[in-house]
């Protein structure tokens, strides 16, 4: 569900379902579900920061989860279902923390989204890739109306004319 959701956002190039930050190599879904590998089920998101920024991606993601829930999303339970943001660029930490801090006041319980550097990532089995495209009506914890929110969230803005004083300051008299 999260991969399909993220793919709806303009500026997201690719998504890949996988397993992150565990303690074995090349885990299978079955191994991850056993709960002893330390992996979280994740979605790698590659995006164009000139089209969509990290803050918007995080805010949209947070709309699809309960950020106060530990080891559970929807009907899925277990440590592999913990929520997290795993970054590959430490310069993103400030944006991640600020975005999380900004939503914290909306909740009565503490935010428990894990924020850590990505230590390892293994692509999940092909069955999990593009799951909702291959399984119309398949189980998804994300409410259907949120997919439309993702599609509209980053719509291109129409040209906005600058005010006259700004135009005078940047244009020559001939222009």
Where do the model's predicted regions map?
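Flexible coil/turn and secondary-structure edge motifs
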Residues: 1-175
